[in-house]
């Protein structure tokens, strides 16, 4: 069977920081280009890292196979094969999903996805693992902050 691919971004703060830094590289390149009237080698060389980081940021994806969910991150060596049997539960809201698994350091991880992609991803996941618990949660990711605050006090 064909692999299914779904694109994602990390939680909101990390996404904003990543794309802000990426577009800073673009703006530096454009500023350098405006300093000269003709093509400017340094400006073009600075634009190359922008395209590399833009591609890496867009290429984050889930690849779903018969037995695992492959989480592809920005860095190629951080690609993680998450066995479907290790996924305990999935919660979602209109813009993000949270996957609970013992494979993650913190026990769960939040992924931002497009509104149209979330139902397709959940449906594909339910086909591969019918007994999976899927629940809607509008306070996605906030329970970690509450637990941390309780443990500090």
UniProtKB/Swiss-Prot annotation:
Disulfide bonds: none annotated. Its main location: membrane. It comes from the Bacteria. It is a multi-pass membrane protein. Pfam families: EbsA. The chain crosses the membrane at residues 12-32, 39-59. Keywords: Cell membrane, Membrane, Transmembrane, Transmembrane helix. GO terms for cellular component: plasma membrane. It is found in: Cell membrane. Seems to play some role in the cell surface expression of a chromosomally encoded receptor, named enterococcal binding substance (EBS), that mediates mating aggregate formation. Might interfere with the synthesis or assembly of EBS, and/or assist in the localization of EbsB to the cell wall. Belongs to the EbsA family. This is Protein EbsA.
